[in-house]
């Protein structure tokens, strides 16, 4: 049995201690926000926050998390959307949506650790977006950082010309 806190609730998993956190969350706790993408630490779709830091839940066994504090996308905020979620919507980041939860969790952890991240910190995020939403992701990070520093987000979409990055065809790769 492994005990931890998940989204503020005490949880005991009666599973093999070598069970990846991703499967404990999805199958035993019915928290399906963390996505299965690769099972090889390559995509970041399974990102959750463990003790304040972003962790790929496919790559960590529950046995190593005894007493840990886990936050999933379902527990990122209560009531109102988290500033990263608000910025994600305001910048219209989502395309296919598969990477959304992992990206949002990684960005929330990044902004908690580094309230005004530079391009190098943003580029170092391990998450991959295959849709090529990189420019919108960067704008969402900047918007969320500003909101977290100054208060509630504006929810209306500002009118602005499209950048050359947005009008270019999608590129293969991480989209960061």
Could you describe each region identified by the protein language model?
Residues 1-176:
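Signature of N-terminal electron-transfer/Fe-S-associated modules in redox systems
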């Amino acid at each position: 049995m492994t005990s931890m806190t998940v989204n503020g609730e005490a949880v005991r998993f009666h599973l093999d201690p070598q069970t990846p956190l991703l499967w404990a969350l999805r199958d035993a706790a019915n928290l399906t926000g963390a996505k299965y993408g690769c099972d090889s630490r390559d995509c970041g779709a399974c990102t959750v926050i463990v003790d304040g830091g972003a962790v790929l839940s496919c790559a960590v066994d529950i046995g190593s998390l005894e007493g840990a504090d886990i936050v999933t996308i379902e527990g990122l905020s209560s009531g109102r959307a988290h500033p990263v979620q608000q910025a994600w919507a305001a910048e219209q980041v989502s395309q296919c949506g598969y990477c959304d939860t992992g990206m949002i969790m990684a960005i929330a952890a990044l902004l908690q650790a580094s309230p005004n991240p530079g391009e190098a910190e943003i580029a170092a995020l391990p998450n991959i977006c295959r849709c090529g939403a990189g420019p919108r992701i960067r704008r969402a990070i900047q918007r969320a950082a500003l909101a977290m520093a100054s208060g509630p987000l504006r929810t209306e979409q500002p009118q602005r010309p499209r950048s050359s990055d947005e009008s270019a065809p999608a590129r293969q790769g991480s989209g960061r």
